[in-house]
Structure formats: structure tokens, C-alpha cells
Amino acid sequence: MKKKKKKGHLKLTFILFIAFLWIVAVFQIYSVINKHKKIDGGLSGDDENSTPSPLKRNTTEELFFINFMQDLYSEHYDIQNVYVYDYIPDDEDIEYDGSSKYYFVTIEKKLKYGSVFQLPFVIGMEQAVNKLNGIKEAKRIYNKRITELKKYIGLPQIENNIFKVVFSEENNFENAKVKIATYHSEISAMRLKPLSDSEMIKDGYGFIISYVSNMRDKIEYDNTAAVKYADKYTSNPLNKAKNENVWNQKYKKYENDCANFVSQCIYAGGIRPTKTWFPESFYWIRTGSPKYHDISGLTTYMQKKNIFSQTNYSGLSAGGFICLIKESHVVFVTSNDSITVLFNGHTNDRKRVSFPHLNESEAMYLTPNN
């Protein structure tokens, strides 16, 4: 009888052990799938149900971009992974002669700062708050920005970029120049390099001083809801300019859909339509860029109604938007740790792509007045 009990006990132990191994295996598979979802950056290829595979490890291209990203970001970030994809621009005017190649590059990085109060921008804000001692609104906006920035400390961030590599000799990466190829007007990729500490401190100081000097009525706006919408309804297509399958089918689509998309994001954040700003209206679908002084649109409307106001690069909150003046184009801000801004957009479709440091003659940085 004792032997039977012993055998039964051993059998039960064996079954439990096998079950445990299955559970461990399932969790490992899930973690791999989940990690892949996190790093794919919303990529979409010709097959909408598949994600393109990155180039093989230790290729010339990958090693080149690992070194390039280290040069750009190593002062402020730990670069944890770099994924390099071939990129095919959807532009009939581009001729391929071997003198240049295009790449889509996803990087996984993490801020080196252990505390939000170590960020140069925050140091600058604190200096301004101390100078404006007793002004409650200065302290309020300081605390709000601190709360926003805390979520970036210690957590990996995914950043996407589209680069054009220009070779001095065909396919020779030595001495090759890298340009940002996000849109038609290409600029040096070195403009992605973060500002110096002193410049970010100055931005932090100026952010508080400017806000207090131009205080506006506080609006109700859900930044998180707006960002979630922006992430849901765009992607990073590798073989075409846009993937309308992921767009919100409830809205009319436009050949130049950038302002339409940003307006949708702002609406998702809780800003209600009016008799002037509503789907398909002029103010909803036009950028309102200063490039066209006599034509109003989204940018002019949001400023006139004091819903958004101009700020600097580091002071821009996720949930804000950027107007590119020369291109008459708008994009929606989905992340800003005060060092690097990421944006989403339509025409062309972009998701979590880094924005270069453009000056006030090139871009307007608009943040919500909440």
C-alpha cells in the first residue's frame, strides 16, 4: 500500500514538473513576442500582416549605424539595440546610382540620468522658479513638466529614423555622410544631436519665464489619450509613403493628410469641435503655416483660441504638435524627454520618429495650455 502511495506521489510530482516547464516555456515565448512588438516601431511592409526582418547582425550597415548612434546620443543615453532595415523611398524623382542608399533605423535607448532633477532642462526650470519665488503658476507648470518627464527615467525608449547615406565611393561607408530623409528636404543627421547642457538649461529657464509672462487660461486636455490615438492610426511603411489601412476609416482622407491627422489627435485629447474647427473644415485640414501669411489653418486657429502656445524644443509636451514652416507641414508629438522629441504623422506616414533641432525660422513648437 505504501509503495502504491509512493508511486502515486512520484507520478503527481512528475506531472507538476512537466506543467511547470510548459508554463515557463509559454512565458518565454510571450516575452519574445512582446519584445518584438515593442521594437518594431509600427513597421509595415507590402504584406500588412508581416513585419520586415532587420538586416543580419554584424553587417557593415548595422555596425556603421551603431557607431553613428553612439556619436549622436552616448552623452545622454545608453544605446541598447540598433535595428537596420532597407528603406525604399516612394518617390519617382529619386534615381539610384550607387552613390547613396536609404535605411530605416530603429534604436532602443535609455536615459543615463537616475533622477528627473538631473536633467539639464529641469535644472534650468528650477532656476527660473527660484527667481520667480512666490508666483504659483511658475511652480504649477514646473511640477506639471516634472511629472511628464519622470516617466522617461529608467525606461527604454524606441526611436525610429529614416536616413540617407551618401557615399564618397560606391557602397563605402568610410567617410560617408548621413542625412535625415524623413521628408523631401534633406538635412544633416547631426541636427538630431542633443543640445549642449548649457543650451538645455537655458531652454528650461526660458520655458518657465515665457509661460509666466504669457499666462493663459488653463484648458482641459488629455495628453495621454491624444498620444494613444496618434500611435493607433499611423505606422512606418517601408515600401510606400503611407498605409491607409491603419488610418481611422471614420474620417475623410486627403492627399495631404497631415493637418487632418493632427486635428484628429487633438480632438481625441478632448478639444471639442467648433463652428470653425471641425472635420473637413478649412481650419481642420490646412496647416496654417506662416509660410502662407494670408491662409489660416490648424496652427493659427489653435494659437488664436489659446489652446496651444509656442514654446521651445525641450519644453514641448507629448500631446503637442510642430509646424514645419518651410514645408507647410504639421506633425504630432508623441514623446519628449526634454532631450529628444519623437513625432507621428501622415503624408508621409511616420510613427515615433525623432525630430531634429530646428530653429524658429524653420519650425514652431506648440504645446497645450493645460
Language-model segment annotations:
Residues N130-I135, Y142-Q157, I339-N370:
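Glycine-rich, aromatic-bearing surface loops/beta-hairpins
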Residues I208-I285:
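N-terminal capping segments
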Residues A128-T224:
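Non-catalytic propeptide/linker segments at domain boundaries
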Residues G42, D47-V82, T224-D231:
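Short, non-transmembrane alpha-helical segments in secretory-pathway proteins
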Residues N245-K253, T276-F282, I325-E362:
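Glycine-rich catalytic cores of cysteine/serine-nucleophile enzymes that process amide/ester linkages
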Residues S100-E108, F282-H346:
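...with weaker cross-activation on analogous glycine-rich loops/strands in unrelated enzymes
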Residues K2-A19, I29-V32:
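N-terminal Sec-pathway targeting helices
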